[in-house]
A protein has these predicted regions:
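Conserved beta-alpha-beta core of the PfkB/ribokinase-like small-molecule kinase fold
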Residues: 78-157, 164, 174-175
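Acidic, amphipathic alpha-helical patches
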Residues: 63-64, 126, 194
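Phosphate- and divalent-cation-binding pockets in alpha/beta enzyme and binding domains
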Residues: 11, 36, 114, 145-146, ...
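Conserved N-terminal subdomain of the carbohydrate kinase-like
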Residues: 1-77
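Short gly/ser/thr-rich secondary-structure transition/capping motifs
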Residues: 20, 52-61, 116-121, 149, ...
Length: 257
């Protein structure tokens, strides 16, 4: 990522350090740190308004692609397709992940405020990532938007045809629809009283990828291990649900135990 050399950037840097996040590849710039203003309704659902700054200046580093070798690479930036150095870097890193035999995960993180009346461009820019990823995580809104289908099972069929072998569609309190070309199953979530859903989807995919990273076989084979995949998603559902019971994003994520 890329942070500004300002108070917000310093705050984020300190917060990530406190949570033992490796910042060795994090970049800084004199452009102000990108801001997301979040409003929350009475059900804990949130809406976003963005003031875009430093994130768009993320520079591609060709000398780190060896770090992707047979590792896991996740693409999940909400602002990744809005132009600038970040979008160029995104494309380069997708190519690097492919050439290094990485397990590729994709979350489009569609935000209405960022795209307004230009959703068609967003869809077009997502297609290569859906085609090349081993795992795609969508919200209901994203699955319908990207597939052009209103029914989720039909949406999954279209998204599989585009290339995604494993699809997880998060549905809030109703759990997650897990789909492969051969099978579909809805995994129930944990019942909670939500106060702030900010970061729930990120907590879900973070938990799922953390579990996948601990497999003793290639995660590319996960689509053939459905019972294991369903159990992983059930745990990730719980993590996402618990995240909604507190305000904030990072501070609300439950500990692994």
């Amino acid at each position: 990522g890329c942070l500004g050399n300002d108070a917000f950037g310093d705050f984020l840097w300190k917060t990530l350090e406190e949570h033992e996040i490796d910042l060795s590849l994090t970049q800084r710039t004199d452009t102000f740190t990108t801001l997301a203003f979040v409003s929350i309704d009475t059900d804990g659902e949130r809406d976003f308004v963005f003031s875009r700054g430093a994130d768009k200046e993320l520079q591609y580093q060709s000398n780190i692609k060896h770090l992707f070798n047979q590792q896991m690479v996740h693409f999940g930036a909400a602002t990744s397709f809005l132009g600038g150095a970040l979008e160029e870097s995104y494309g380069h890193y997708l190519f690097d992940a492919l050439t290094q035999d990485a397990f590729i995960s994709f979350d489009p993180n569609f935000r209405t405020d960022l795209w307004k009346n230009n959703a068609a461009t967003f869809i077009k820019k997502c297609l290569p990532f859906i085609e090349k990823s081993h795992l795609c995580k969508f919200s209901e809104e994203e699955a319908k938007l990207l597939s052009g289908k209103e029914h989720l099972e039909e949406a999954c069929t279209v998204l599989h045809e585009l290339g995604a072998p494993i699809i997880c569609i998060t549905m809030g309190a109703r759990g997650t629809l897990v789909s492969t070309p051969e099978s579909k199953k809805q995994i129930e979530s944990t019942a909670v009283i939500p106060v702030d859903t900010t970061g729930a989807g990120d907590a879900f995919i973070g938990s799922l990828l953390s579990q996948i990273s601990k497999l003793d076989f290639s995660p590319i084979e996960l689509s053939s291990q459905l019972d294991l995949l369903y159990n992983m998603v059930a745990k990730a559902n719980k993590v996402g649900a618990l995240t909604t019971t507190k305000y904030g994003a990072i501070a609300a994520i439950p500990a692994q135990n």
